[in-house]
Amino acid sequence: MILRIPSLLYLFTLLTAVYAVKFDLTSDRNPKPKCIWNFASAHSLVIVTANVPGEPDQQVDIQILDGSERGNVYLSKKDVRGEARLAVTTHESADVGVCLTNRYTGSGNPRVVRSVELDVDIGADAIDYNAIANQESLSILEVEMRKLEAVTKEIVEEMGYLQRREMRMRDTNESTNQRVKVFSVLIICCTIGLGVWQLLHLRSFFKRKYLID
């Protein structure tokens, strides 16, 4: 079966994900970060485009990090104003978070709301295929095939990551169950030993009192 170009384009739109959000960020003197999380494979390009309108007495900070065991912090940018474009490359497969805080620096009411637009492109979505097409003289179909190849590779890597995580969780559950079994056996042995000791102690006590032979 041969897929036509419209079918390829439709399939590509199903596979690719768009992480564009707009939300309100409330200022505070000790603000809590508001994070947007997305999965990214190892060595993936992540481009974050933030549109932060300038407001007086407010400082918006952006931090890009991941949720791995190492807790890698890829970038921290202070006092973002206007449109900012940030690019990082991930070290390992994990959820990547873009965290924003809105710190109030004035002397009045700190509870001021600022609207923020955030666009996160990961992997194939972050690659400039127009530049590649111009550089390598690729046709539209060849460009779409490149996109599909990159997206398919990302899906395979994500499935592998989920499988490895499931195996780690299963190993953890099996280890926990084994420890519970050992602990239960120890409790039973201690209970039996304590019962035997009490019987011997009572027998010795009754003998001293001449209650039994």
Swiss-Prot record:
It is found in: Endoplasmic reticulum membrane; Golgi apparatus membrane. Residues 21-181 are lumenal. Residues 33-122 form the GOLD domain. Keywords: Endoplasmic reticulum, ER-Golgi transport, Golgi apparatus, Membrane, Protein transport, Signal, Transmembrane, Transmembrane helix, Transport. Residues 203-213 are cytoplasmic. Residues 1-20 form the signal peptide. The keyword Protein transport applies. The keyword Endoplasmic reticulum applies. GO terms for biological process: endoplasmic reticulum to Golgi vesicle-mediated transport; Golgi organization; intracellular protein transport. Its main location: endoplasmic reticulum. Constituent of COPII-coated endoplasmic reticulum-derived transport vesicles. Required for efficient transport of a subset of secretory proteins to the Golgi. Facilitates retrograde transport from the Golgi to the endoplasmic reticulum. Belongs to the EMP24/GP25L family. This is Endoplasmic reticulum vesicle protein 25. It comes from Cryptococcus neoformans var. neoformans serotype D (strain JEC21 / ATCC MYA-565).
